[in-house]
């Protein structure tokens, strides 16, 4: 609230399924007394291993029908968005099922080709999770998921506008490719508005230096410390 954000969807990091289901229940139970919390976004565990970013590889799984059912049951209506790599086994079916359950699926953390990404959007995915980050990039002979998103007027495209995740020329390109469909997100983690130092992202150790969060193990970008007012 101090920085002008009056509503939020809480993004939950990849964890074991039992932990994720417990976290969803926690969000559900908080919502009656917290009108600022609109629900949860699951960023994982249905992500592509090559594009996992700062997610725990030991917890990544395929979106089987049983796991989809467990998540929907645990959420009891609080799950608003879920990021899925559409190329995973059961990926397209999971997107369709979440969509029919009232959840907004998002394509992201993926290594999908153009055709598979299109299938994901046709199945109900209405968001691209932080475009340019944690996905295969633009290539003239292998277009990938980005052109599939920008050409589809149904898709809202997220960008992390901190000058670090995405450089300014690429932010401008995003607005040029999909005017009126760009949504700034923070991808913020626990160190947001806090001093540099050591933090945790799920079970993973993160070092924050000069406001930039990276995994201690391999230096991979581990979310951001961005405030939405600064992104705008």
Report residues per predicted region.
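Non-catalytic positions within long, well-ordered alpha-helices that form the structural scaffold/packing
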Residues: 1, 28, 72-75, 99, ...
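Active-site-adjacent C-terminal substructures of enzyme catalytic domains
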Residues: 94, 116-232
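Active-site glycine- and acidic-residue-rich loops that bind
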Residues: 16-22, 87-89, 105-111, 159-176, ...
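Charged helix-capping and loop-helix junction motifs
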Residues: 23-26, 64-66, 141-146
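Generic structural signal for well-ordered alpha-helices
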Residues: 21-28, 68, 95, 171
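Conserved phosphate-binding/catalytic loop of the ribokinase/pfkB sugar-kinase fold
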Residues: 48-74
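Divalent metal-dependent hydrolysis catalytic cores, especially in the metallo-beta-lactamase
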Residues: 1-20, 36-48, 75-87, 103-106, ...
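N-terminal active-site wall of soluble small-molecule enzyme domains
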Residues: 69-71, 88-97
């Amino acid at each position: 609230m101090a920085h002008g954000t009056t509503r939020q969807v809480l993004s939950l990091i990849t964890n074991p399924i039992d932990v994720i289901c417990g976290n969803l229940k926690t969000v559900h139970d908080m919502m009656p007394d917290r009108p600022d919390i609109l629900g949860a976004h699951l960023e994982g565990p249905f992500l592509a291993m090559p594009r996992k970013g700062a997610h725990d590889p030991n917890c990544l799984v395929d979106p089987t029908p049983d796991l989809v059912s467990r998540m929907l049951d645990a959420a009891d209506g609080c799950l608003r968005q879920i990021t899925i790599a559409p190329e995973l086994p059961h990926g397209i079916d999971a997107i369709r099922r979440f969509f029919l359950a009232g959840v907004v699926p998002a394509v992201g953390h993926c290594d999908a080709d153009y055709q598979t990404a299109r299938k994901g959007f046709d199945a109900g995915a209405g968001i691209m999770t932080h475009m340019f980050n944690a996905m295969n990039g633009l290539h003239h002979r292998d277009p990938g998921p980005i052109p599939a998103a920008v050409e589809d007027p149904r898709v809202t495209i997220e960008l992390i506008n901190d000058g670090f995740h995405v450089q300014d020329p690429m932010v401008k390109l995003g607005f040029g490719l999909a005017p009126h469909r760009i949504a700034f997100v923070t991808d913020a983690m626990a160190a947001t508005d806090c001093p540099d130092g050591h933090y945790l992202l799920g079970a993973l150790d993160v070092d924050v230096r000069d406001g930039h969060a990276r995994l201690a193990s391999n230096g991979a970008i581990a979310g951001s410390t961005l405030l939405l007012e600064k992104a705008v």
